C-alpha cells in the first residue's frame, strides 16, 4: 500500500504516529517538525511521555518544511545538543488549512534525510486528499520510512488508522502497539 512493504492497523492516528516515534528515536533525541504540527501540538504530549524525545521546530510554507532551515539545524548539532534522528511531516497540513506538500518536495526531503542518516515519518491522516489532488500514485514507501493514515478521513470508515513501513518496522510496531494497549483483541477480528 502506497509503496510500503507492510502495514499495521492501529486504533488512531495518534497511536500510529507515536509508534513511529518509538521506532525511529531513542530517549533524549530530537524530531524536526513544524511549530504547528499535529504530532507536536495535538497528541497530548505523547511523544515526550512515551518516547522521551523533544521537537525542534523549523520554518515552513503552508506545511512544506524549509529544507535550508533543516540543513542549518543539522549543521548546528553539537556534543551539547540532542541528536536529531527524525523528520516528521504532515500531509496534508491541518494547521495550514489542509494544504498539500507537493510529492516532488517530499522526494527532495527524502534525499536529504537518507544522506544524513535521518528517518522520515509522514503523518498522513489526510494523505488521500493530497494523492487525489495531485493525481499521482505517490510511492511514499520508496521515499519515507513510515506513514500513518486515517480510515475516517477521506475514506469514511468509523474507526482506525494504518501504520505503514518496512517488514521489520511493522514487526517492531506490532510489539509497541501491544505494549501501549492497542491490540483491540475482543473488538476486532485478530489483526
For each predicted feature, which ranges?
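Active-site PLP attachment segment
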Residues: 47, 141-171
Amino acid at each position: 500500500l502506497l509503496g510500503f512493504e507492510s502495514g499495521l492497523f492501529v486504533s488512531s492516528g495518534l497511536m500510529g504516529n507515536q509508534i513511529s516515534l518509538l521506532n525511529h528515536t531513542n530517549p533524549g533525541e530530537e524530531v524536526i517538525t513544524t511549530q504547528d504540527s499535529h504530532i507536536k501540538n495535538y497528541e497530548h504530549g505523547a511523544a515526550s511521555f512515551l518516547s522521551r524525545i523533544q521537537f525542534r521546530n523549523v520554518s515552513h510554507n503552508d506545511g512544506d518544511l524549509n529544507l535550508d532551515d533543516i540543513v542549518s539545524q543539522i549543521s548546528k548539532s553539537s556534543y551539547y545538543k540532542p541528536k536529531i534522528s527524525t523528520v516528521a511531516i504532515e500531509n496534508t497540513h491541518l494547521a495550514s488549512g489542509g494544504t498539500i506538500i507537493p510529492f516532488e518536495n517530499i522526494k527532495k526531503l527524502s534525499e536529504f534525510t537518507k544522506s544524513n542518516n535521518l528517518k522520515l515519518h509522514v503523518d498522513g491522516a489526510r494523505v488521500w486528499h493530497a494523492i487525489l489532488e495531485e493525481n499521482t500514485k505517490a510511492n511514499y514507501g520508496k521515499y519515507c520510512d513510515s506513514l500513518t493514515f486515517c480510515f475516517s478521513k477521506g475514506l469514511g470508515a468509523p474507526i482506525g488508522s494504518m501504520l505503514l513501513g518496512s517488514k521489520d518496522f511493522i514487526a517492531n510496531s506490532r510489539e509497541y502497539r501491544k505494549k501501549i494497549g492497542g491490540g483491540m483483541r475482543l473488538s476486532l477480528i485478530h489483526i
